[in-house]
From Swiss-Prot:
Residue sites binding substrate per the record: 82-84, 217-218
InterPro entries per UniProt: GTP-CH-I_C/QueF (IPR043133), NADPH_dep_7-cyano-7-deazaG_red (IPR050084), QueF (IPR029500), QueF_N (IPR029139), QueF_type2 (IPR016428)
Pfam families recorded: QueF, QueF_N
Name of the gene this protein is made from: queF
Reactions the enzyme catalyzes: 7-aminomethyl-7-carbaguanine + 2 NADP(+) = 7-cyano-7-deazaguanine + 2 NADPH + 3 H(+)
Keyword NADP: yes
Name the record gives this protein: NADPH-dependent 7-cyano-7-deazaguanine reductase
Signal peptide bounds: none
Any Gene Ontology CC annotation: cytoplasm
GO molecular function per UniProt: preQ1 synthase activity
Subunit structure: Homodimer.
Alphabetized UniProt keyword annotations: Cytoplasm, NADP, Oxidoreductase, Queuosine biosynthesis
EC number: 1.7.1.13
Amino acid sequence: MNTPQDSSLGREVSYPSQYDPGLLFPIPRSGARAEIGLDDAALPFVGHDRWHAFELSWLDPRGKPQVAVATVQVPCTSPRLIESKSFKLYLNSLNSTRIDSAEALRARIVADLSDCAGAPVQVEFGLPGLRETPLGESIDGLELEIDCYGPPQADFLSANAGEVVEETLVSALLKSNCPVTGQPDWATVSLRYRGPKIDRAGLLRYLVSYREHAEFHEQCVERIFSEVSARCQPQWLEVEARYTRRGGLDINPWRASPGIAAPAATYRELRQ
């Protein structure tokens, strides 16, 4: 079984000079899910991992360089996630490769990523536009003392069963760390839900308690979804984290209660 420590993360690697789908490094989702009591065969959520790729280039049949940007969507039901540095190296391996057309390139990327993830992956050229302010109500202006930065503390979460609301809460203060390199991962996270009103101060303390936590982006979002669901008992819940760019890629994991329609990729955060 592949582990993060087996990947190219934290290692000096030479950039590929020719196309090589073998650079893609899959990591099973099951291990991290088991740690928080999730079973791949009975997931409590639907969702996807949406990537924005900013550094995509190849050669046309005459050798002229071409450039593009792309949006990639990996279903959360795939047995494997795609490690980000390997994804970057894979895209770099296309830089000196002659390809008949943009559509031929897209089809090749779809096939390679689907094989890596173990499920059909969607790839489209183009990116959503920027939005200066996130959709929802920010909780970052709350005045409170915080002294816990990890590990994540679900005990901070609570909700008022006597007041049922439907709202979207947003924080730009989510930070976690790569489990291999220790590099910081920054994100704006939004929680849209209907149910007992979530205590905002407790939610902010909970999100800040990820600050020294080491876990991949996708795993953090699944942990947030699971712990908010368990502690606050919403009727339904959506959690999305929009991470800042690294190596020409940003990732946006989204998890939601079954039956919730996937959001359209209509915008990117200003920090992306």
